[in-house]
Every structure is written in structure tokens, then in C-alpha cells.
Design a protein with these regions (language model features):
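Alpha-helical tetratricopeptide repeat
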Residues: 1-128
Length: 128
């Protein structure tokens, strides 16, 4: 039980640091969670959070590597935010067709999301 509390506390601190734009501290905490939770059902969630930190830092290849790991997890329910993050990362890596595909999948899951719609327009402008 105490390991759950520890995991919960570490995640809470990581998210607090993320909100405060302290991405290095958030990455350190997420790295600890990922290492400790190698078999945790939450590992993919931690990888997604870490991918967002990498995205914010401009470390797009690292972000894509984490997103690819999440993609392999058949048990992780991928929400629109996964596809939005993947679409952004692929956009910044100039993989526009793949970016559009990810964003369209995200839009299917959240049809009224204006942020995803804006990103799709941005990608389509690059494809012209």
C-alpha cells in the first residue's frame, strides 16, 4: 500500500512541476516512476506524460520514442490527448502525413476539440 502512496505522491509532484513549466524536475520524477513501475499498469500513462515533457523541451525524437512505447501497449486505452500529442510531435519532425493521421484519429475520439482541428489545419497547410 505504501508503494501506491509513494507512486501517487511522485506522480502528483511530477504533474505539479509540469504545470509550473519545470520540465526537468518533472522528467526526473517521471523517469523514477517509469523505472520503478516497469510492470505497472500505469507505465504507459507515465510514458505519455514524459513524452509531453519532451515535446515541451523540443526533444521530439525522445517524445516519439515514448509514444511508440505507448502505442505497443494493447491494454492502454488511448484517448484523444495521446493522438494530439503524437500529431504535434510528428508535425515538428516534419512527418506531416503521419501527423495528420494521428490528429484525425484524435478528432474521431473528440469531435468538438478545436485544438485538434487547429492542428489539422496547420498540418494541411504544410501538405499544400
Amino acid at each position: 500500500m505504501s508503494s501506491d502512496i509513494s507512486e501517487e505522491s511522485l506522480l502528483s509532484t511530477a504533474l505539479d512541476n509540469f504545470i509550473l513549466d519545470n520540465y526537468e524536475a518533472a522528467l526526473n520524477q517521471l523517469n523514477s516512476l517509469i523505472t520503478k513501475g516497469e510492470t505497472s499498469p500505469n507505465k504507459s500513462e507515465y510514458l505519455l506524460y514524459r513524452a509531453v515533457c519532451f515535446l515541451k523541451q523540443g526533444k521530439f525524437e525522445n517524445a516519439l520514442k515514448d509514444l511508440d512505447e505507448v502505442e505497443k501497449d494493447a491494454n492502454y486505452k488511448k484517448e484523444y490527448n495521446y493522438y494530439l500529442t503524437r500529431g504535434k510531435v510528428l508535425y515538428y519532425l516534419c512527418k506531416f502525413e503521419e501527423s495528420k493521421k494521428a490528429l484525425n484519429t484524435g478528432l474521431e475520439l473528440n469531435k468538438d476539440n478545436n485544438l485538434i482541428k487547429d492542428w489539422i489545419k496547420k498540418v494541411e497547410n504544410e501538405l499544400k
